[in-house]
């Protein structure tokens, strides 16, 4: 990202100059997943447990959603995370923008659709 959070530290991620691309988010999640940061493993596992959304034994979904608003309109939705299957781990970042109805739930729906086309059923 560009590290520009501005003066409003309570809401710097909404409507500010802060820019973090989906690719940068994916890279961050990959490093968290493999603990390339060298953090205490218990702390990394605590974060992973906190973002676990579902576990149906063959597919585990970890992630976080968000919604950016302008006035009452949902204009920016995102869903970032990773999915563990028996055979692989997939790291993803979905970001959608629109004049309205762009929210975290819509980003989940898009993500679910993409993985279902890959043959991976997500229970969220």
Identify the residue ranges that each predicted region occupies.
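Mid-domain, small-residue-enriched loop/turn segments at the edges of structured enzyme/sensor domains
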Residues: 1-29, 34
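Structured C-terminal helix/loop/strand segments within mature extracytoplasmic catalytic/sensor domains
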Residues: 26-124
